[in-house]
């Protein structure tokens, strides 16, 4: 019987702590500080169906998460397993970095969340709700800035997202008017409770996808749109970087730095969108079987 492979426990001169490499909260790609990396030490990748679940194998050994859990997905999400296998199959032979594994690390996070106790899930919800109080989509520029043109773009692009979010979740969101200056901003307790109830309805896969997008784009609202399939990753990144893009169009940019940052954001948001769509497919298949 083949022994499961726990990468971050391997004693190899070429392999740093896999837990560090896999850390979701990574340094941005544009950072001058080098990211942790490790060398490729396998030749073949494959998937294996076992007991209604799909496992990912490298040279016949099961892939494990940093916490030691076997990385596996339900049979109804088999596409996700193939995407993970593809990530590992396409890795270069040297200097593998964590941003090369966006889907793998996201699935690993979902597996960890599935083991959370009630208190841990509540803490995660509290952390996510804080992003709604400082949501990018709810903070508007002063009318005097850029002759009010940036504010016009924000209202045109962001306001529909705010209204959709409010209608779907039955809440009324307050927003920060730039003309009011820098002041504390927080949603009502009633809104927080409704949002908490919605978060409690999400499964571990949905929470992992949502957590990643929230942390990347700093917007609870945009992340909700990605999870529900209302926005693709390209559009979500553009909406998140609306102010930066406006300034870039006006003043120019540090080309390489901005491009790398934007690609890194789109890459992470795309992994959240992919997982969200796989979850939808799984639910659709379950409904088909039920009928």
Curated annotation (Swiss-Prot):
Query: Which GO BP annotation is one of this protein's?
Result: mitochondrial proton-transporting ATP synthase complex assembly
One GO MF annotation is:
unfolded protein binding
Gene3D superfamilies, per the entry? ATP12 ATPase, ATP12-like
Localization, UniProt: Mitochondrion
Question: What domain of life is recorded for the organism?
Answer: Eukaryota
| Keyword list, A-Z | Chaperone, Mitochondrion, Transit peptide
In which broad location class does this protein mainly occur, judging by the first location in its UniProt entry? mitochondrion
Q: Name one GO cellular component term.
A: mitochondrion
Report what the protein is called. Protein atp12, mitochondrial
Which portion of the chain is the transit peptide? 1-10
Q: Which residues form a coiled coil?
A: none
Q: What does this protein do?
A: Essential for the assembly of the mitochondrial F1-F0 complex.
Per the UniProt record, the source organism is Schizosaccharomyces pombe (strain 972 / ATCC 24843)
Please state which protein family the record places this protein in: Belongs to the ATP12 family.
